[in-house]
């Protein structure tokens, strides 16, 4: 039996004690193979060399995968003790460089290799005991203690791969080639690459919480897309095919590169792929621990920026619209080839999961239908920056696994490489790296005129905008009902027996009341807000059906939230709502003819509230209602003091806002009923809330 070959665990079926045994074996095999990787380092001193100036030395990663278990087990409250607090702080956080020149120049007092190995032994013993003793029930889900165990195992398997890339960047004299990490012996010239058709189709991505396999948070949720037909290269781009770009001077010609790519190329002074070595008239290839004559029929390994430049060059040379595939297009291609998933395959359908070699292999060796290397050999760069699926939820035990990458600057790689194991080798895996990042990664090009859709799904992080998102669509607090929803319901009660034609939500913020008015029966609802931020979010909710936002929990700690119209039962009415940006004190003429105007907590934020009130009757139909709410929290930040309706003294006497409202509106409006108090709560942090009382008044146009 090849000790390198393992499969991730099916967590939903079988006998509990048998599952315990499977997880125990999986844990130890993961620890073993990770330590086997570090045996390729020739000297103890090698552990302290920086293979990549943007990364830590390998001693960090040797300790990191072990401390991860302890840190996550403590967060999950499975254990309440530390083995080595110093190590568990020092090895906790890696380098997440945001640029190729983002150097980490800090000095670290690293422990010895022997000290770290002794610590790893302690962790292994502790986790072994936990696996043997913790209560285990099936299925194993997000809340199970064994999910934390699986999290540690799969995390270590990620670093098995990323550390192998760092070892590959060490000086050759610092590493040793071991038989365990065997190199593919096959090499030669590649076949001519050609484009083959991939018919149009639909892809459905995303896991449900009950999925049988362990997954990282970005895999959950749901995404559906109709994919236009395209032509895809039969093979990954081989070294020989990429050599044409190098020899054509592609690395020196600005026209082929993106702005980001050219800046990287200029900084690194790159002339060819990182792992190519020019040796006189010949080329060598650096594998993980050896140098060999460059196999022309192995896939080239480059970053996204280089792959993109090649596609631009190749497109110009051929006259074809060539580019990298999107994530959806990659899945469409995989579906066409009908490839089984790990752990369900009997034998890997590619050079993946360490089931073939510990290196790349020829691009025409692993057939998948008419194509080759749909999975395995090297990862494949895509055009898609990673984004969260609808229904995405953060796992509380690892709340920063994915969200820092939802920035539009981390592109997805698909398919896995020869050393991708565990979760990395599954179809649902979604790993993304900065575009300059080096990995065992290459690419396949496609021919398509379809535009590349970039999902602008970053979380709203502006504190005020996020507070409004939570106030409109989030939880209730302290028994106080949702304020926009309450306003809408009161308006609908007031409109009983009246015409439900056209309503205006003036100062709509992020739109909840407008949607609720439409649900309540209005045939048309217009939402207006002066703030670009709020208008944009309301429009996004209408157009895309969901919002994502980050709320401050404590200090720099935030929580991430997603709300959807479908969950609120508002999807059927969104076509009856329209949002616009407008100044309430200077409305365009087209905004008129309303049966109801709701101006919730608006007047004390206007720069000219008297002007607003003096002209608002022109926007209402005769008999229409104007509903105002306000806490009358006048501030010169928003309104010059001479424009305040109340909240000041005149001739020594207090002037109240309600009295001024009556004075201003009475000539054209009739006050219906007595004013009433309407409470609302604004969440600032997990432990800080504002409780306010707005006064609600209802006015009927004469």
Descriptions of predicted regions:
Residues 2-56, 63-67, 75-136, 147-171, ...:
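Disulfide-stabilized, aromatic/cysteine-rich ligand-recognition loop
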Residues 152, 156-158, 166-186, 191-215, ...:
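Functional-site microenvironments in short loops/helix caps that host divalent-cation chemistry
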Residues 478-500:
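Conserved alpha-helix/loop element of class I SAM-dependent methyltransferases that forms part
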Residues 540-586:
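S-adenosyl-L-methionine
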Residues 553-554, 639-675:
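Conserved Class I S-adenosyl-L-methionine
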Residues 585-597:
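A short acidic, Gly/Pro-enriched loop at the edge of an enzyme's catalytic core
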Residues 610-622:
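A short glycine-rich, Lys/Arg-flanked "PGG" loop and its adjoining helix->strand segment in the class I
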Residues 623-631:
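Conserved beta-strand signature within the Rossmann-like core of class I S-adenosyl-L-methionine
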